[in-house]
Amino acid sequence: MSCKVRVIPKRDSNPAVLACLIAWIIFVFPVKGDQTIPQWHRLSDKPIISPRGNGWESAGTFNPAVVLRNGTFIMLYRAQDNTGSSRLGYAESTDGIHFTRRPEPVISPEAGYEKDGGVEDPRLVKFGDTYYLTYTGYNKKDAQLCLAESKDLIHWERKGVILAAYKGNWNVGWTKSGAIVPEKINGKYWMYFLGTSSDKTDQTGLAYSTDLIHWTEATREPVLPKRAGKFDSRVVEPGPPPIVTQDRIILIYNGADDRLVYRTGIAMFDRNDPTKLISRSDDPLFFPAMDWEKTGQVPNVVFVEGAAEKNGRYLYYYGAADKYIGVATAD
């Protein structure tokens, strides 16, 4: 099965640059009309990480961030206990599929904006020798987008809330899911994020910063809005940090329909103007199919948050039914 993306031709696309990207990035080459792109397939029919024990990761292990460090896949994942409080666990792998976990979380709820609810849904990006972690701080009242930094991915320094809830240009609710573009553009850092519009649907906005700590919304409306009748009619939520090519920003995102079935989409923005949407997938690349993706704490969910490339192959890590972690690719 495949899906289609409506593509606007771009004469200066560079195949040599794009060839090293994911298999489905072929659609950014200059073509006219519809271009068929392959859907992802699972590298394991079973979860690669599951809940365990009776403690901090007993109820759910899901929504992972992944980076490659010195040839090793490093994963930070959301772990939930039986009270519903979340922490971030740490795991390592040499092949990207079989992970060894640390026995204790690397981040636990400590700040007031995290108390009771916890730290949720990590995403990782690196600038220089520092890793930056965006995550949701949830205190059982508000969910807000937060930042922490680290040199070793184990010891983290909090930088606080970076986009406050209820205070956006168009967002009237919580802030979540900060996917930072891994390169500065026009002298600024850019971040796609989730906000809630006045009609109570969740959509994707864009913010910019000069220091990664103080952020300003770039627009007065979502840059990746919902679409009636599509797989993303109710929720349009950023996935992993985007991939940057010569002239494109490629954003994997998570879409939910009116029945709150979560599937995976892809959008393409102008590299020189991150607010400018060029195209997006008409149909999902990936969707719940396995029993453990359909049944869990929240049914019918695949939610991609991590992506890592090794030896020319991209692996995509996702939460399944808010309980498990899976991995997929497109080759």
Regions found by a protein language model. Give the residues of each.
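Short intrinsically disordered, low-complexity coil segments enriched in acidic
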Residues: 1-3, 27, 262
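N-terminal secretory signal peptides that target proteins for export/translocation
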Residues: 1-12
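Bacterial N-terminal signal peptides
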Residues: 19-27
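Beta-rich carbohydrate-recognition and catalytic domains
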Residues: 33-117, 125-234, 243-300, 310-331
